[in-house]
Amino acid sequence: MTTRPTDNETDVASVTFDAESENPQARREHTSYSARRSIVTLLQLEKYSALWVWAGLILIFALWVPGTFLTLSNVQIILSSQAVTAIVALGLIAPLAVGAIDLAAASAVGFTGMFGAVLMAHSGWGAVPTIAATLVLGCCIGALMGVLVSVVRISAIIVTLAASSVLSGMVTWLSASQDVVGLPSQFLSIGSGTALGLAWPFWVMLILCLCAWVFFDHTATGRYMHATGLGPEAARVSGVPTTRLVVLALTLSAAAASVAGLLGTARIGAGDPSFGPSYLLPAYAAVFLGSTQVRPGFFNAWGTVISVYVLATGVQGLQLAGAPVWIPDVFNGLALLAAVGIAVVRQRIAAHRALARVRRLVMSRASR
């Protein structure tokens, strides 16, 4: 499908052409700029720069620690072990899309994992009813937070921070600060089973990624969520049900956290009271870094998953090279700062370019 240039675009193009024809220096600068743009377009750097970074990291660590990094077992470990982080990150896309911050996601991972473990180990529930009950509970927690944010009008940061504290306390109460063991083999097989050499959680994550991609990029509700985040008042005036969308967003985030909690517990093999909180930072780092990929400027599923594995590759490579145990936290924190910084710089560059085009257009019309 071809599009016809607008009058403004035609005017800007003519002004640029006139300026270049009169000024050889401008013409050379334009040629250099065009060459750089051609390289960027060829390599798809604006959309897929993380893939090139990922390839670079793989090459660096393959040369640095060749005996351990570039092996089949290490690739399987990276892909399988990061599935839970990726699921948490996919869930965070929803609240961020509507302009909310969910600080309870990681605590919800720990709580739902412990809740499911207690039901099976202490109450004798089977795997299937436990999974169903845990998912329902997770959705109810998310919906309650959504109501407090969108209906009662309490700040999302306050609501989710309070919820995080409550859920962490509930984990301690349910577990008595002890591991909950004795989970049924049917449930444990979800975490230990493999297909094509990769753990089941990886395939669950991949399915959820596909669902998130369809929902956020190809449905009206997903587009309305992005519209709500970009301008809630404008979206509300336009008829977008922003209140319901905020409730839905936090419900989806909690549902994803519940899935992650169950899968993580199945993979560990027991209910671990310390499980969950450590996922918050890498998940947010991946979501913000993902917003600079695939669909720059929008929180999106594929960019998020790619970013999860870029960060995981860096951390795993450093650990195999003998880096200290505190490296993952530092690495993910710096990655979060870098991701937000890149997003801000891109917005400013886009605004600067738009302003420059407007100025050239105004000057051309004033000179006529």
Predicted regions and their residues:
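Hydrophobic alpha-helical transmembrane segments
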Residues: 48-52, 78, 86, 107-111, ...
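Transmembrane alpha-helical segments in multi-pass inner-membrane proteins
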Residues: 257, 267-332
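Helix-loop-helix "hairpin" substructures at the membrane interface of multi-pass membrane proteins
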Residues: 125-130, 134, 140-145, 149, ...
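Cytosolic-side transmembrane-helix boundaries in multi-pass membrane proteins
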Residues: 2-59, 237-244, 314-368
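Single transmembrane alpha-helix segments in multi-pass membrane proteins
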Residues: 55-123, 147-154, 287-301, 334
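Transmembrane helix-bundle core of multi-pass membrane transporters
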Residues: 152, 156-218, 245-248, 267-276, ...
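Short loop segments and helix-boundary regions at transmembrane helix junctions
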Residues: 40-42, 96-101, 120-122, 126, ...
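Hydrophobic core segments of alpha-helical transmembrane domains in multi-pass membrane transport
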Residues: 50-63, 91-92, 164-168, 204-213, ...
